[in-house]
Amino acid sequence: MKVTAHRGYSGRYPENTMLAFKKAVKAGCDEIELDVQLTKDDVVVVLHDERIDRTTDGTGYVRDYTYEELKQFNAAKCWNGRYETMAIPTFEEYCLWVKDEPVTTNIEFKTSIY
């Protein structure tokens, strides 16, 4: 049986963050499932929703922000201060990290506009 970490170890850590991905690998998952969105300046970021409202302290659509603007928002907002501030990771950041890890990646492109 294969164990997939949905949005990383999202039951214990902020979803789709580098911390959630690292903790999922440490816990022994075989695969990480993540979601990607495209910013206004064409940077691929790891985030489930088209809007940033649910998982960050910002509002609006990912596509309306450049990555420089987007990374100011706290991707750990839902955890009420339990974790330090975390930026939304870029897909490149994830790829640079995961290339040395013993897991596969399931990537979902979540958008209704492309």
Predicted regions and their residues:
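Phosphate-group recognition and catalysis centered on beta-loop-alpha active-site segments
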Residues: 1-114
